[in-house]
Amino acid sequence: MNNSSGPIAVIKTKFGDIKIQLFPDVAPGHVENFVKLAQDGFYDGTTFHRVIPDFMIQGGDSNSKNEDRNTHGIGDPGYSIKAEFSKDLTHKRGILSMARGTDPNSAGSQFFIVVADSKFLDKQYSIFGEVIEGMEVADKIVDVKRDAKENPLEKITMKVTIRS
């Protein structure tokens, strides 16, 4: 899918930039939430705290700014948003989707980019964008050394900006 009507998110990392086309027509609440968090600087300084080869890279947890790695992956913005599952889109390589807890309506700020087709996630996680440039950056991130919790041993911080 290439929806050129939505905003573009740029995730800047030490490995380069990941440029993402957001899909407000597919998941308006998720796009609005992501854009607001990015514009408020919420994501700046957070890390990709969970990377799993042949699956995905996950970031957007405010706790990932902390040195205590045991808190990484459990942070949120203090609220959650309702799921918006797509009937038509699939979790193919390059898709941006929202992470959540066991409740489908528990997404907040954490997101992931799939680095390999992961159709088993379809209709369970809210797709709200797709990488249009910089997938090689995601591939570099997913290949870093990590601990037993899939948390990279080196900090991979991000700065997220939005272009209309």
Predicted features and spans:
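Cyclophilin-like peptidyl-prolyl cis-trans isomerases
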Residues: 1-164
